[in-house]
Every structure is written in C-alpha cells, then in structure tokens.
C-alpha cells in the first residue's frame, strides 16, 4: 500500500505543474486521499464486508467531495484533478493512467440491472463536468470534452464533445462531417435568439398596425 502511495504521488508530480513537493501532495490533494481511501474500501468490499466498505467510502466523500463506490474497479495511475463532485458508480471500470477532472460522473441511466456503469479503457481523459452514463465501453486513448454527455460507446483514439456527445476526431484527424452544433465555444444563446425573434415579430406588427391606421385615415377622409 505504501509503495502504491509513492507511485500515486510521483504520478501527480509528473502530471500537475502546480504540485511543488511530495509533502504538499500528501497533505492537500483530495484526489489522492479519495483514491487511497477507495483502495481500503475496495479490499473490504471484495471480502464481502460491505458495510465497512461503505462507511469508509462515505467518510472519504465527506472529506474530499469525491464519491467512489467501493465496488468500482480502478486500474493503476488514476489521477483525479481538483475532484470536487466526481462520482464513480459501483460497476464502473477504469483502466490504467486515466485522468478525471472535477464534476465528472461515471454513472448509470436507471434502466439497467447488473452492470450499470461505463468501462473506461486506458489513457482516457474526461473533462470537467462530463457525464458518462450507461454500461458501455469507452476505448483507449479517448478524450471527452468538458460538460459532454456520453450515452454510447466510443472507439479507441477518439475525441468526443457535445450533448449528447459525438465523435469529432479519430486518431488525431478531424471528422469533417461533424455537425456545427458541436462547437461549444460559439454555441447559440437561446435567450438572445428568442429576443431577436420577438423583435422581428414586433416590427411586423408595427408595420401591420401602421397599414391599418393609414387605411382607416383614408376612409375617414373620403
């Protein structure tokens, strides 16, 4: 367990430019604390001491803001950066060297029994606020953009963005027929669009009212 902790600290120092020392990481990185607690809880879970496992995971959630079910299967090298609001479900599987940012959910849809949560391959990056929901596989070397909602399987070496998530890159090459609504920087503002529509409608009504007034005045002058 101690050697695993040393590996986790070394991994964080390698990946996070804000990490200045092993001592700082050990004391202040909530992602490290959550994963360390998960390993203890997972041991109890695997030995069918479910209540103890859940107590450990709940205490870790209160302390870190990260909820990892002790039944989840997590490979080596997981880095949870910032971490607040991360949720990992009971039947989720995470491969080696994955990176999860704050607000990520590896959850279910409420429709499935047994295997309910996703399986992530190795070297997967899941951006902040993204949701991966359902019992499907996300391949190796996949990147999921911030706030994406993934509801279907993603092959290896792809980048997915949007709600619902769609693949925009495969093996580093852009998919040219991807729809324009996947542009998350220049997404349309629904309030602005509605105001513009109302402005057009007001102008149309003003023209119609002016036409009626002109017709009425012409009738009076006869």
Language-model features, listed with the residues they occupy:
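Structural signal for interior beta-strand "rungs" in well-ordered beta-sheet cores
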Residues: 61-168
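A structural signal for small-residue-enriched, beta-sheet-centric alpha/beta enzyme cores
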Residues: 166, 170-178
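Solvent-exposed, flexible loop/coil residues
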Residues: 30-31, 36-39, 72, 78, ...
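Terminal amphipathic alpha-helical/low-complexity segments used for targeting or macromolecular assembly
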Residues: 1-59, 175-222
């Amino acid at each position: 367990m101690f050697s695993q902790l040393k590996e986790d600290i070394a991994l964080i120092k390698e990946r996070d430019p804000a990490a200045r020392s092993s001592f700082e990481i050990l004391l202040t990185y909530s992602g490290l604390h959550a994963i360390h607690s998960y390993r203890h809880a997972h041991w109890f879970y695997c030995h069918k001491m479910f209540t103890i496992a859940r107590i450990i995971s709940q205490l870790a959630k209160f302390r870190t803001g990260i909820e990892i079910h002790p039944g989840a299967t997590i490979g080596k090298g997981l880095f949870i950066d910032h971490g607040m609001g991360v949720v990992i479900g009971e039947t989720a599987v995470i491969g080696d060297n994955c990176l999860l940012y704050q607000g990520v959910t590896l959850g279910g849809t409420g429709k499935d029994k047994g295997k309910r949560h996703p399986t992530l391959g190795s070297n997967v990056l899941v951006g902040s606020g993204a949701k991966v929901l359902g019992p499907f596989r996300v391949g190796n070397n996949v990147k999921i953009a911030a706030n994406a909602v993934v509801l279907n399987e993603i092959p290896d070496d792809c980048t997915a963005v949007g709600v619902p998530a769609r693949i925009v890159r495969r093996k580093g090459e852009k998919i040219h027929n991807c729809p324009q609504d996947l542009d998350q920087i220049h997404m349309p503002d629904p309030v602005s669009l509605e105001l513009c529509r109302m402005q057009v409608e007001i102008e149309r009504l003003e023209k119609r009212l002016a036409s009626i007034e002109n017709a009425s005045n012409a009738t009076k002058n006869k």
